[in-house]
Design a protein with these regions (language model features):
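SAM-dependent methyltransferase catalytic-core segment centered on the flexible catalytic loop
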Residues: 123-202, 210, 251-252, 265-298, ...
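Conserved S-adenosyl-L-methionine
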Residues: 145-152, 183, 210-215, 221, ...
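Active-site-adjacent helix-turn-beta-strand microarchitecture at beta-sheet edges
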Residues: 259-385, 389
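DnaQ-like (DEDDh/DEDDy) 3′-5′ exonuclease domain used for proofreading
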Residues: 1-130, 135-188, 336, 345, ...
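Phosphate/ATP-binding catalytic cores across multiple sugar-kinase/actin-like superfamilies
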Residues: 111-114, 118-121, 185-190, 196-199, ...
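Short, basic, low-complexity termini and linkers enriched in Ser/Thr/Gly/Pro
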Residues: 153-160, 486-500
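Conserved Class I SAM-dependent methyltransferase catalytic core
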Residues: 170-229, 465-487, 513
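Conserved helicase/translocase motor-coupling segment
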Residues: 555-572
Length: 642
């Protein structure tokens, strides 16, 4: 019987298997020091890296130097990204909004661990990621990752502590590993984030001058240099700070990379009246409004230098050093098709007609985003204060319009949008706003560490103990505001049967595994003690905790509908019309097993204590074999006991 592990995949082992498939001669064995004992030596598969390097090189490898970007702790960051964890996401209905109907998620917890838990459920499903990570200004909040060096120097350094006793490190410029710590923190998260993107997906990352250079190099490594799209300059300020000694910085950067540049599609910016006003139709051309472009171009190419006779009889040559854009044969064709314009008098220098109907609907974006178009920092702060009755509960939020522009450029109406440094939840606000304006059904996933608010802050005094509480309340208030505005405007997109605006969200919180420690280390207990254990599951875990733990284990989305019902005295949960059916009751009667099996779910799960004996478990599997389709395959992969 195959039991679920309830831990994220061991990516290191998976990567070794992939290498073995390509280069079997590069796989060897080495002593597994963690699992070996004095009585028994245990070996594990490993990669012969020297041989692998030679296999990938056309020349003899002899320690040649190569261009690379590295820092102290880079290898540890890679190990940290691949390391499995024993954690889960526990639902919190009390803090959610419209739990039963929403497809949005708000996840509280360290984003590195959350990204690991999302690897199976959202692999290749996220169309766009926007993140606004710490800028590493010397006082920014850095996550308590395992790659940090262990020494007395780091242990005594000032910092804050999480509720679990983990130090939440503030990266100061006196730290000898100032840039290294920041690079390690971001690198491991980018590695995991890339896996979640669709093939045509993109990521936007806000950053300032402190780490812009390093971030761009890391993105080139993680996403590939060929998948770089643009580095946008956002004009975040409109007035100088006179106290600055040299320059007053007025901009930040937004790095944009694709998972696969060849697959990514830019929608362009919406065309406005100003853009369309450049087109008119003075000659009543049946093809509609048009504008004209210069027919001459440089440098001069002799084959494209020829005389043009205007309708008025004037002979026209291109200017000195220039030639015509079209060769003579193509020009004559365009002239016959009425695509050449000599002016109303017929005596002007010829120009090429460009019709509005032929222009792509989206305007190609430029790399400078002005505050007049996407907002500035002060405007973002003001608008957030307006949501909270004039109170400033969050410093330096990003403008909603800024993220809306990114959404318009690279998301479609049914995309999943991820922000794993969600802060004040501006991205969630932007997703709801864009959906309200274009009738879309974009879904958001917000991830945020519950960083405690300063007890002297206005937010703490108002009852917000951590940033997550501010973010969730911001989504609630923004959603209600957007819905109210749309209803007041009688917006047609809200009146169609299938376009109900989703302003809800399911709250999930990162926690330890649902299983007791004995589940992972049975060798630590003798047989008599094992028999005394009634359940492998922790006492404080509910059916909903177990259900969502199974969703993560099986790689199912966490936002789909489910229902619970009573069958012969047992509670049965059906997720997304049969993707998974679960019963976590004790002593499950055969009638319930038969009823579940007859529904032919794709997956089914029971609690170990649901069966009093091994024969009962075997009988359960036999019942499923009886009712499952013949092509169902190995039943133990579809039916599990936890």
């Amino acid at each position: 019987m195959r039991k679920p592990k309830f831990e994220t995949p061991d990516l290191t082992s998976e990567n070794i298997e992939k290498i073995a498939a390509l280069f079997p001669n590069c796989i060897t064995e080495m002593l597994d020091e963690e699992r070996s004992t004095p009585e028994k030596r245990v070996y594990k598969r490993a990669v012969n890296f020297e041989l692998l390097k030679q296999m990938l090189s056309p020349d003899v490898v002899d320690g040649d130097e190569a261009y690379e970007f590295t820092w102290v702790g880079k290898k540890a960051a890679i190990v940290e990204a691949n390391k499995p964890i024993r954690k889960t996401l526990r639902p919190c209905m009390a803090e959610s909004k419209d739990w039963d109907n929403t497809e949005n998620l708000y996840i509280e917890g360290d984003n590195l661990e959350v990204l690991k838990l999302l690897q199976e459920s959202y692999l290749g499903k996220v169309k766009m990621i926007y993140i606004d990570p710490p800028y590493n200004t010397g006082n920014d909040f850095i996550y308590a990752d395992d790659f940090r060096m262990e020494s007395e120097e780091w242990k005594v350094e000032s910092g804050e502590w999480s509720e679990d006793g983990d130090r939440l490190f503030k990266n100061t410029d006196t730290n000898g590993r100032f840039h290294s710590d920041w690079c390690s923190m971001i690198y491991s998260r980018l590695m995991l984030a890339r896996n979640l993107l669709t093939d045509d997906g993109v990521i936007f990352i806000s950053i300032d001058d402190n780490e812009q250079e390093n971030l761009k190099k890391m993105c080139s490594e993680v996403f590939g240099e060929d998948n770089f799209i643009a580095q946008v300059v956002w004009e975040r300020a409109f007035a100088p700070i006179n106290l600055k000694k040299h320059f007053s910085e007025s901009h930040d950067y937004i790095l944009c990379c694709a998972k696969n540049l060849n697959a990514a599609v830019c929608n362009g910016l919406p065309r406005n009246a100003e853009a369309n006003d450049r087109y008119n139709n003075p000659d009543n051309d049946p093809r509609g409004p048009w504008t004209s472009g210069d027919l001459s171009v440089g440098p001069r190419v002799e084959s494209k230098v020829y005389e043009i006779i205007s309708p008025s009889g004037r002979t026209i040559l291109p200017p000195s050093g220039y030639c015509w854009r079209l060769d003579q044969k193509t020009f004559e064709k365009y002239k016959m098709e009425n695509r050449i314009w000599f002016g109303e008098s017929g005596d002007n220098v010829p120009r090429i007609k460009r019709f509005l109907a032929d222009v792509k609907q989206g305007i190609t974006p430029m790399t400078i985003w002005k505050y007049s178009d996407v907002g500035h920092s002060q405007d973002a702060t003001k608008r957030l204060k307006d949501l909270f009755d004039g109170k400033a509960y969050f410093d330096y939020p990003k403008p909603v319009a800024l993220i809306m522009r990114a959404l318009l450029l690279y998301s479609s109406k049914d995309s999943i949008i991820l922000d794993f440094f969600s802060g004040s939840a501006t991205t969630a606000h932007a997703v709801m706003q864009v959906n309200a304006e274009d009738g879309g059904h974009r879904k958001f996933i917000m991830v945020q560490l519950p960083e405690p608010c300063d007890e002297a802050s206005e937010a703490y005094k108002a009852g917000y103990k951590n940033i997550c509480e501010i973010g969730k309340e911001r989504i609630r208030r923004a959603g209600e505001k957007i819905l109210k505005e749309q209803l007041a405007n009688n917006n047609s997109t809200l009146n169609s049967p299938n376009s109900k605006l989703d302003i809800g969200f399911r709250v999930l919180k990162l926690d330890s595994t649902n299983m007791k420690d004995v589940y992972y280390a049975p060798c630590d207990y003798d047989q008599d003690f094992l028999h005394q254990l009634e359940s492998n599951i922790k006492d404080d875990r509910t059916d909903l905790d177990l259900l969502f733990g199974c969703l993560i284990e099986w790689g199912l989305p966490l936002s789909l509908p489910y229902k619970s019902e009573q069958i012969d005295g047992c509670t049965v949960h059906t997720y997304n019309d049969g993707d998974l059916i679960a019963c976590f009751d004790a002593n499950v009667p055969e009638s319930v097993v038969k009823e579940i099996a007859q529904r032919k779910p794709l997956r089914a799960v029971f609690r170990d204590s649901g069966f009093e004996s091994s024969p009962e478990k075997i009988n359960m599997f036999e019942i499923f074999k009886l009712y499952m389709p013949e092509d169902a395959g190995d039943i133990t992969k579809r039916v599990r006991v936890i």
